[in-house]
């Protein structure tokens, strides 16, 4: 497949400065227009924090109007990243390759909530995702009125059919 975008998601202020001209991730926690201004000095597109409510987004965009801001509108928020293989440690496996089996693993809490675990066999990193999926696709027109122009979808364990439906919903909301 051709590469449509070779930009890197900057997940920290250090990587943002080092990899200038890329896209900031929501991990930078852009929650006010001062942070947005700083992030725009180093990034071509800045993703606003998912923790902002509508009034906070409105305030940010009123104080720093720009056409190159983004917002996560669908996906499970990454809650934790560990530089260790959670599966290997859990199953006490030596020379473990459990994560290569493509099974879905979940962490279940005392309330029976299921947190998806993603693994990266290349660097033995584990990611724990929120048990609830954020779905703000219906609010895209409202966010567009504020001046937000980029809408991100993070897919993790969705089926092919779910993926097509999510993308179709998004396309309808942004009038593609």
What do these predicted ranges mean?
Residues 1-176:
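Active-site pocket-lining/capping segments in soluble small-molecule metabolic enzymes
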